[in-house]
Amino acid sequence: MKSLLDLFKQFTPDEHFDAIKIGLASPEKIRSWSFGEVKKPETINYRTFKPERDGLFCAKIFGPIKDYECLCGKYKRLKHRGVICEKCGVEVTQTKVRRERMGHIDLAAPCAHIWFLKSLPSRLGLVLDMTLRDIERVLYFEAYVVTDPGMTPLKKFSIMTEDDYEAKRTEYGDEFEAKMGAEGIKDLLEGIDIDVETERLRGDLTGSEVKVKKNAKRLKLLEAFKKSGIKPGWMVMEVLPVLPPDLRPLVPLDGGRFATSDLNDLYRRVINRNSRLRRLLELKAPEIIARNEKRMLQEAVDSLLDNGRRGKAMTGANKRALKSLADMIKGKSGRFRQNLLGKRVDYSGRSVITVGPYLKLHQCGLPKLMALELFKPFIFAQLEQRGIATTIKAAKKEVESGTPVVWDILEEVIKEHPVMLNRAPTLHRLGIQAFEPILIEGKAIQLHPLVCAAFNADFDGDQMAVHVPLSVEAQMEARTLMLASNNVLFPASGEPSIVPSQDVVLGLYHATRERINGKGEGMIFADIGEVQRALDSDQVELAAKISVRLTEWTKNKDSGEFEPSTSLVETTVGRALMSEILPKGLPFSHMNKALKKKEISKLINASFRKCGLKATVVFADKLLQNGFRLSTHAGISIAIGDMLVPPQKAEIIGRAEAEVKEIEQQYVSGLVTAGERYNKVVDIWGKAGDEVSKVMMAQLAKEKVIDRHGNEVEQESFNAIYMMADSGARGSAAQIRQLAGMRGLMAKPDGSIIETPITANFREGLNVLQYFISTHGARKGLADTALKTANSGYLTRRLVDVTQDLVVNEDDCGTTNGALMRAIVEGGEVIESLRDRVLGRTTAEDVVHPETLAVLLPAGTLLNEDGIDELELQGVDEIKVRTALTCETRYGLCAKCYGRDLGRGGLINLGEAVGVIAAQSIGEPGTQLTMRTFHIGGAASRAAIASSVEAKSNGSISFNSTMRYVSNTKGELVVISRSGEIVISDNGRERERHKVPYGAVLTVRPDQQVKAGLILANWDPLTRPIITEYAGQVRFENVEEGLTVAKQVDEVTGLSTLVVIDPKRRGSAKVVRPQVKLIDANNQEVKIPGTDHSVTIGFQVGALIQVRDGQDVGPGEVLARIPVEGQKTRDITGGLPRVAELFEARTPKDKGTLAEMTGTISFGKETKGKVRMQITDLDGKVWEELVPKEKNILVHEGQVVNKGESIVDGPADPQDILRLLGIEELSRYIVDEVQDVYRLQGVKINDKHIEVIVRQMLRRVVVENTGDSTYIAGEQVERSEILNTNEALQREGKIPATYSNVLLGITKASLSTDSFISAASFQETTRVLTEAAIMGKRDELRGLKENVIVGRLIPAGTGLAYHQARKAKDAMDDAERRAIADAEAAELAGVMADDDTAAVSVAGDASAD
């Protein structure tokens, strides 16, 4: 009976496995899987539809077609379970065994597995140390390979053609053995003695780099074979497994035809060729015929395994390449990505969304019909429980007839049962949120307006999907973790996500504006009720300035109670009435201002930090209700008259046109080049456009009114368009500028700027030419959008893949390392304050007062708003905080190093998947930004070029240590250093610092006192000068026309300038660099003071020479100018690829050079086209590098440089930064560069997220010195693994291995993870699986992705606890288990005894009564 009951139990696979191993299958293993050999190519009988015996669908091998019924029908029903029918040989069992039973084909000749042959690098080639070409010739019967040379001078592994073979046979007879085809290769593989080979290779890791590399690779492979117990011979197959038939189905279509899986065709070909070959061999057919058949068999097996990898793909009847086994698992529609990582979900529906303004934040409107369908099982259960229906069938009928009781039950079932809403594309975790459903009529889902920002949803036809969490656990998680009212902050930046937008903002803004001399101005009210009555009776207007007595609630620090305090406040009617909805504990000053979108965001943020989540959600809902009401009352609309075109516009445009004419004039007379002309014209128009928009906004923003006392004053305008833009409800200055200013410069599709701007605006209307130019930009916007969305999605996918296994898995790793944080200052402006950078991080060491050195905060404190306010008061300007990069946790991160969970506002919880959050935070805006280009209609947005710096604050001037300058003949100071900075400090505290470029003219001196607004330095932004530091007479060297310089005659002007040309372009052999030497009055060469080197100033390619031979020059004079290329428009288009480039750690095109060590620069002998640059350090060690002459060298003879300093101009290579400056500097570089791109678009992302990704890029190390470990020098290993190995070695007193950091790009890092399942499901599936199978890899299932694929809970969030408990349970040995079981039994016995005594005493009590 028990066995019968077990039968109906749900079949659950034992999920107590900790790892999955992949390996090569031996022939014995394949036979052990098989249930019989497939001998015939037949599939099913076309008349009876029964499978043919011994065919590809044979019931005897694979199992019955109908449940518990044999093929001939002799045995039917459950009672014969397990019987094997003697007539048809079919076992009586469930038909689903046809999904798991395999067959096999015995190959008449061995066949090589194509993956190990053709997947690069060829594994067969590595093992045999033969070239792929040779192996292929042997395998496909074009050549012989010597398998046993015997006593002959032939070499084993050598290749010979047919003719050679015949000759050698006649020469040596049967002394040697040579074979063709896979047999030969198999013999060679089986003849390899792995131990001997590894010993030989270990001793041979010397010599040329190529050889060492190759030997190391071979060694690694052979060691893997040895370790995993896989024999190399198994790469050549003798037995081919056959997939279970239900996984390659054959379905009859109507009309007598069949739809079949391609695999059946491929198997059929293999079987046909195999049986033909077997017959030929039995008939002892001539060698040449058998050989051809063997080749064909090899090809058939190849295309079964991976069609199209070698030669032409096999095609079916319709000329379409057949889908082989490899195609089944790889790519977007393969097994991994289609079925394992992305599944379709039951209990789900989708519909259009509409707005539900009356909903609470945690609710959504669910159409009744949809709910009825989704909650069916729950309704059935209720119907049965109440006895309304007796069977499921009856319940179904009841539901379908739609009786009132069904709807009542539905209401009840839905109560407190959250559903999840998802809007595709789900770019971050706020793309799926849970809501409590409210049943509504109609067919559209209703969505709360405040969650639209998080979903990025609007109501122009968007659709959303609904999912029902079924189990109690799922409901609980949805309710506690995913409910919309629990997710009010963006995980990317920690800012509120439930900020109102559009009409709500407009309503709130309009109600909180103040109007000078409004109706009822100056009235004083006793309380808010009085204000409301005055407004209702039309005594005052909303925007009038009044005074009113308000009650504010402040939290008592000690008791935690709220205490009221009353005061008279000057405010406006609207603000006073709005104060009613403020949560307790938020001061009225937060609301006593015009509420723009930014202000509302700050208000909600302040509320969250001060009053907590619940109060904030309620507050946001009230804001929303009021905003809708007020914007309706306001009734703001726009008319064409609101677009005021500034009267100064014509004059500004006239001025610009005059300037452009002047530039054209200069161009015609040859003072500027064509490139400079274009740049200057674009610049003039850019500035003119900005000026027009400035005067336009000034005109829109202010209006003149008469105040109470009859004076004319200015107030902020009540112009509708201005109010919309100013409040942040809709539109921006850029759009208003196009309506009422001028459209300005447009960009071509390639990003270059069209130099004729559109001077008209939409209010005036465009003429045909202007319209035509407009279409350029607009089209670029749309094309961009389409292309970039895909790129951004791919970037997100790579980021998620590289970080998916990073989870917070301990509280504190105990490290004291960290990074120093200070405010980011550029051009004297604080771009990101220290506050923003350290908020929500943990201090790495005590924070001390800068002067008294008193400890303000101990190490390990989480910095929150209050703590930072305190530190800002004390004047702390740098703090060392813990970062994700310096965390010492293995296989994860610790909570302390990560700091605050930005999406929830407290310290991060254990089990939080911070890697995925980081990836989503960086990927999500990428998609956003790329979808946002077309709004401005392609109007060129270009960062105006700086040509000067001005002081932003008062103080005294000092220069940094690298600043060098000379005084020129006019007495101006000219900067001749590359990294000079002007520092303004006040009382010893640095206020600002500005970088000044080479060639700038300084207008201040050291220690000068300056006032804010003073110009400190200016320069020509469009050219880069080459300046002399010394005086003398110019003597050109190698300045020969046609050789190093060319006369550039301008087509327009006929004037000529000398321009330096690339010496590579001409035929002369000796390479010369055009340069200037200076001659003093005595006709001697001027020397660099303190050395005997002559002053030589080289010209770069492209420089325009400004001086003549023999001219006298003074210090600071310009010898030549190099024009700077025209600027492309900078938007995220340049930005997204830039982000991808940084995360892929690509070496930039013309990368700059960093100094390899600290020392003195000197220049050695020049070689062809290159300068030999040398650095000599204090110990006399010399490092040298050849630098191409056209590169801009930033240093000069005799200059002392520090390790890692830039010495040749160009973008830095992250690999160099890591090598020379270390991890912290690298992280700073990547974080800053990525942030620059996003900041340009006004997107806020916390630095943490970028650091998390950099941590993952640095997770592998390169072994340098192997010590006593089994590693090979130069091998890449996971950092955690080498740390574990080294600890084990040190415990045994052996020498640990040393290693150096290596930076991998995100794609590379994803593919080189220890988890082969994760890597295979990412990209290059074939290569990853091939490698893993040969290595016999184990996947420890640490990451999220691997666990999703094998169908377990992920080791993050609530799953982390589950996995830890499971591991702990597995770790308990049997003895402990027994002990616990005994204890429990004893306890149970005790309880029983207790129960007995208790029962007795109860009885006693009863009788005592």
From Swiss-Prot:
**Molecular-function GO terms, alphabetical:** DNA binding; DNA-directed RNA polymerase activity; magnesium ion binding; zinc ion binding
Q: List UniProt keywords, sorted A-Z.
A: DNA-directed RNA polymerase, Magnesium, Metal-binding, Nucleotidyltransferase, Transcription, Transferase, Zinc
**Reaction catalysed?**
RNA(n) + a ribonucleoside 5'-triphosphate = RNA(n+1) + diphosphate
Query: Which residues make up the binding site for Zn(2+) 2?
Result: 813, 887, 894, 897
Q: Which GO terms describe its biological process?
A: DNA-templated transcription
Cleaved signal peptide residues? none
Q: Which Gene3D superfamilies match?
A: 1.10.132.30, 1.10.150.390, 1.10.1790.20, 1.10.40.90, 2.40.40.20, 2.40.50.100, RNA polymerase II, clamp domain (4.10.860.120), RNA polymerase Rpb1, domain 3 (1.10.274.100)
Q: Where does Zn(2+) 1 bind?
A: 70, 72, 85, 88
- Report the cofactor remark: Binds 1 Mg(2+) ion per subunit.
Answer yes or no on keyword Methyltransferase.
Answer: no
List, alphabetically, the GO terms of the cellular component aspect: DNA-directed RNA polymerase complex
Q: What are the binding positions for Mg(2+) in this chain?
A: 458, 460, 462
**EC number(s) for this protein?**
2.7.7.6
UniProt xrefs under InterPro entries? DNA-dir_RpoC_beta_prime, DNA-dir_RpoC_beta_prime_bact, RNA_pol_asu, RNA_pol_N, RNA_pol_Rpb1_1, RNA_pol_Rpb1_3, RNA_pol_Rpb1_3_sf, RNA_pol_Rpb1_4
Cofactor(s) listed in the protein's UniProt record? Mg(2+); Zn(2+)
SMART domains registered for this protein in UniProt: RPOLA_N (SM00663)
Read off the NCBIfam families from this record.
Answer: rpoC_TIGR
The UniProt entry, under PANTHER family, shows:
DNA-DIRECTED RNA POLYMERASE, DNA-DIRECTED RNA POLYMERASE SUBUNIT BETA
Reported function: DNA-dependent RNA polymerase catalyzes the transcription of DNA into RNA using the four ribonucleoside triphosphates as substrates.
What does the sequence similarity comment in the record state about its family?
Belongs to the RNA polymerase beta' chain family.
Its subunit composition reads:
The RNAP catalytic core consists of 2 alpha, 1 beta, 1 beta' and 1 omega subunit. When a sigma factor is associated with the core the holoenzyme is formed, which can initiate transcription.
UniProt-recorded name of the protein: DNA-directed RNA polymerase subunit beta'
